[in-house]
C-alpha cells in the first residue's frame, strides 16, 4: 500500500523583548538560576500580571508579514496542567481568540512552489526549566525562563514530507529574524518546534492518528525525527496494528522517538479566560503604526536582488536567507561599485567558506563588508588575479590588515606589462622545444603546460587574459 504523510508544525518563537510578557523581570539568557524571576513569575499571591505592549507589537508585526488577520479583540486564557517548572499550576496562553489567524507562507522544495497555511499565532508565557544534572538524583528547577514571551505559530496540516517541514521551518526562522522579533537561536531554545505527524493511505481524505514529537531544536533533528516517526507508524499499520495518539520525544543519540505520555486534548487543559487580564483590544491605528515598521521581507528582497543585480534564483535565495547576509552583500556591492555577480561569488563562496570553517555567522566575520569590497575592487581592476585574491583573503582573515596593504607588502600585483610577459614566454618556449613541436603538430592540450610554466615563472602574478593572448600568438 502507498502511504501519504500529513504533518503540521507548532513553532515556539521566543520574542526578543527585554522583559517578560506579564512582568518586568529581564529575559537575558544564561543568568544564574532563579535570578531573573519576580513574584509574578513565581506565582506568588497578591500580584497581578500586566501585558507587555512590545510583545503585542511583535505578534502583530508577524501577523502582517504573513498576510494574516489581526484580531481586534483577543483573549488570554489559563491552560491548566501540573508540571514542576510551572509554578502557578497553569500557563497563560490564548485559546479560541488568538491575536493572529489565517496567514500563509510560501516555500520552495525541489523547484516546486508550495503555500503552507498558518492557522494561528498566539501569545503565551514560557514555563521554567527542569535541571536533572548535578543534583545527586534530584531535579532542580530554574524559573528564569518562566514568563518569557512566546509566539506559538501553528501551521495547517499542509506539509507532506520531512523535507517540506524543514523548508517551512527554515523560511519561518528567516522571517522572524528579518522582522527582528526573535533571535532564532535554536541552541538556547529561542526557536523550537513540535511536530504533529500522521500517515494515511494515499488518496484518503480522512486524517490518520497523529503523534506529537516535542521540543525539536535543530533543523536536522526535525528531519530525522519526522522520518523516523513516519517509518514507525507505517510499520505499525502494515503489521495490522493501530497507531495511538500520544506525545513522543526524539532521542538524537539513538535516532528514535519514544513515548512520553498519551496526547492531551484541549478539554484536558480546562481552558478558561484569565480573570486577571482584560481582553486585548488592538486598534486599526496600532496596526497601521506597526505596519509602518515592516522591513523589506525575504521574498520581496529575493525578487529585487534578481531584478536589480541580475542574480540567478539560487544566488538570490542564498544571499537573502538571512537579513544580515543580504545587508552584508549589498554593502559589498555598494563599496566595490563593481560587478554584482563577482561580489556575490566572493560573499557566497570564498567568505562563506571561511565562516563555515570557523563556525561563525556573517555577523561575526573577521572581514567586514568594506574590507571584502576593497579586495573585489582589486580583482575588478586587474591589480591581482582571482587566484592571488584568495591568498590575500586568507591573510586578511588570519592576520588582519587591508587588501591593499597585503598586496603591496607581499608584492602581489599582477604583471600587466606586455614586454615583461613576452620576455617570460620567450624563455619558456626556448626551454621547451620538444613540447613546442608537439603543440604545433596538433597537440593542443599542451597549451595548458605553457600557461602553467608561465604562471610558475611569474609566481602566479601574470595577468591571465594577457598571458593567454600573447602565448597563443607566440605558439603559432
Swiss-Prot record:
Keywords, sorted A to Z: ATP-binding, Ligase, Nucleotide-binding, Protein biosynthesis
Enumerate the GO terms in the molecular function aspect. Answer: asparaginyl-tRNA synthase (glutamine-hydrolyzing) activity; ATP binding; glutaminyl-tRNA synthase (glutamine-hydrolyzing) activity
Q: Does the keyword Magnesium apply?
A: no
According to UniProt, the reaction catalysed is: L-glutamyl-tRNA(Gln) + L-glutamine + ATP + H2O = L-glutaminyl-tRNA(Gln) + L-glutamate + ADP + phosphate + H(+); L-aspartyl-tRNA(Asn) + L-glutamine + ATP + H2O = L-asparaginyl-tRNA(Asn) + L-glutamate + ADP + phosphate + 2 H(+)
Domain of life the protein comes from: Bacteria
- What are the GO BP annotations of this UniProt entry? glutaminyl-tRNAGln biosynthesis via transamidation; translation
Sorted alphabetically, which PANTHER family does this protein's record hold? GLUTAMYL-TRNA GLN AMIDOTRANSFERASE SUBUNIT B MITOCHONDRIAL AND PROKARYOTIC PET112-RELATED, GLUTAMYL-TRNA(GLN) AMIDOTRANSFERASE SUBUNIT B, MITOCHONDRIAL
Role:
Allows the formation of correctly charged Asn-tRNA(Asn) or Gln-tRNA(Gln) through the transamidation of misacylated Asp-tRNA(Asn) or Glu-tRNA(Gln) in organisms which lack either or both of asparaginyl-tRNA or glutaminyl-tRNA synthetases. The reaction takes place in the presence of glutamine and ATP through an activated phospho-Asp-tRNA(Asn) or phospho-Glu-tRNA(Gln).
- Protein name per its UniProtKB record: Aspartyl/glutamyl-tRNA(Asn/Gln) amidotransferase subunit B
| Organism expressing this protein natively | Methylococcus capsulatus (strain ATCC 33009 / NCIMB 11132 / Bath)
Q: What gene is this protein a product of?
A: gatB
